[in-house]
Amino acid sequence: MTLNNVTMRQGTVGMQPQQQRWSIPADGRHLMVQKEPHQYSHRNRHSATPEDHCRRSWSSDSTDSVISSESGNTYYRVVLIGEQGVGKSTLANIFAGVHDSMDSDCEVLGEDTYERTLMVDGESATIILLDMWENKGENEWLHDHCMQVGDAYLIVYSITDRASFEKASELRIQLRRARQTEDIPIILVGNKSDLVRCREVSVSEGRTCAVVFDCKFIETSAAVQHNVKELFEGIVRQVRLRRDSKEKNERRLAYQKRKESMPRKARRFWGKIVAKNNKNMAFKLKSKSCHDLSVL
């Protein structure tokens, strides 16, 4: 996944459904539901400083990709939700390059909305990451709208706080009710995985919750940037799997399988055979597959 541009946006326009604006003020009052973001107008950009040469790489091997983007960038609105203090803003800042020296042009226009163009499996995509769940003001109104505007959701909890895990389960139920007729990609994110001695929620509990609520699961550590790259690659793949044609997704899967080891292929093959006649084994396999963000 190769990162290109980053934008953090915060605006002041009124709520007009006709406008295709991604500006979001501090109180979230002007949050808009829109389906197709427009191309953003030209703005002055600030290039990275020379000392930013030690940038952490966020690329997934795509130099030999068999897939190319034929219609330009695709936009995905991804919403961060979860209890306060679980690390949502830290994940957003890492995504935006705040905690990572940048080797590309970037804009800093606000605190709530982050835009980044990246490459996943050889195709360009732009994630517009919304992190306004805890904004002061009309929280109930804002939460309702957050449930409506996302193309995908990251429900974040802290592995050191069981209450945040239980809240994440509640949010999954609320999201299902709000988007009953839609197949929305959701990833349950157990953050702060580096705090091993303070763990209150086990990995198996996270997996089970993901299986029960039909979503994906990953543990991350924003503090040491563990699995953060994989998280944002994964959410792009999850949206694509639901939106794009079967043929296109098969090409992507073939691209990914070329890099898969033979032992892993063998385990996956035999696992499917055993699962056909064993419900308990099928549940275990589904629990394991919830970690795989490249499949539905």
UniProtKB/Swiss-Prot annotation:
Residue ranges crossing the lipid bilayer per the database entry: none
Residues the record lists as binding GTP: 82-89, 191-194
UniProt GO cellular component terms: plasma membrane
Protein name per the record: GTP-binding protein GEM
Taxonomic lineage: Eukaryota, Metazoa, Chordata, Craniata, Vertebrata
Organism: Pongo abelii
Annotated family: Belongs to the small GTPase superfamily. RGK family.
Membrane association type: Peripheral membrane protein
PROSITE patterns in UniProt: RAS
Subunit text: Interacts with calmodulin in a Ca(2+)-dependent manner. Binds ROCK1.
Region (Calmodulin-binding): 266-285
Organism superkingdom: Eukaryota
Any one GO MF annotation of this record: GTPase activity
Pfam families: Ras
Major subcellular site: membrane
Region (Disordered), start-end ranges: 1-20, 37-68
Biased composition (Low complexity): 57-68
Compartments where located: Cell membrane
